[in-house]
Amino acid sequence: MGHRITTQSRGHGGPTYRAPSHRYKAALKHLGRAGETVSYKIIDIEHDPARHTPIALVDVPDGENTYVLVTEGMGIGDVLTWGADAEIRNGNTLPLQEIPTGSSVCNIEAYPNDGGKFVRASGVQATVTDKMEGRVAVRMPSGSTKWFNGQCRATIGIVAGGGRSEKPFVKAGKKYHKMKNTASNWPRVRGFAMNVIDHPFGGGGHQHAGRPKTVSRGTSPGRKVGHIAARRTGRR
């Protein structure tokens, strides 16, 4: 069969195909618990290999300093507040039921006190659109509307780092370093372009499969490439 093909190596789970989570700085969560109001000062803004948005290091007087998500307009020295009594201001975090309709929000909790799950990517925002009987409707970046428990917390503002994807990589080396921080297999080489020992479709005087590209569901792992258990192939 030749060498172990890429899909088999990925399934084995070596470090090449795993995200380097040992380099990630922190899992960004909302601070404080339900019913309490806390304020912390931003002492630094840093880059985290785990994400494309900057993160803020905040000073926690009675514990270890921790990181939070940065919204557009934040700066070193700003004081951020978490709690129902917080001011309606960029960067502050409140329960959704306390945030006015029409406000831009990010880092929304799926359930109260889970720390934040939705709208965390660079440059994205959601909008509070409606409130009804303890539930709040939010228009997500995808355009769909999702209802949340009114006690779920969210940060007011737009996630920092917008426009990141508009800047070209220019050099393959920069793309390489970006992809090394993820679990992605990059660059991805086509099976046709490989040597015959590296892939069932490899080898030959020109790039072609040289064998049927449809395989059964129970095919052995080294041959299970192409159209797997396909009902049909080709154009309709």
Swiss-Prot record:
Ranges of Basic residues composition bias in the record: 224-236
Keyword entries, A-Z: Ribonucleoprotein, Ribosomal protein, RNA-binding, rRNA-binding
GO CC aspect terms: cytosolic large ribosomal subunit
GO BP term (any one): cytoplasmic translation
Biased composition (Polar residues): 1-10
GO molecular function: rRNA binding; structural constituent of ribosome
Top-level lineage group: Archaea
InterPro entries: NA-bd_OB-fold, Rib_uL2_dom2, Ribosomal_uL2, Ribosomal_uL2_arc_euk, Ribosomal_uL2_C, Ribosomal_uL2_dom3, Ribosomal_uL2_RNA-bd_dom, Translation_prot_SH3-like_sf
Annotated segments matching region Disordered: 1-20, 202-236
Role according to the record: One of the primary rRNA binding proteins. Required for association of the 30S and 50S subunits to form the 70S ribosome, for tRNA binding and peptide bond formation. It has been suggested to have peptidyltransferase activity; this is somewhat controversial. Makes several contacts with the 16S rRNA in the 70S ribosome.
Quaternary structure and interacting proteins, as annotated: Part of the 50S ribosomal subunit. Forms a bridge to the 30S subunit in the 70S ribosome.
Family statement: Belongs to the universal ribosomal protein uL2 family.
Stated name of the protein: Large ribosomal subunit protein uL2
Native organism: Methanospirillum hungatei JF-1 (strain ATCC 27890 / DSM 864 / NBRC 100397 / JF-1)
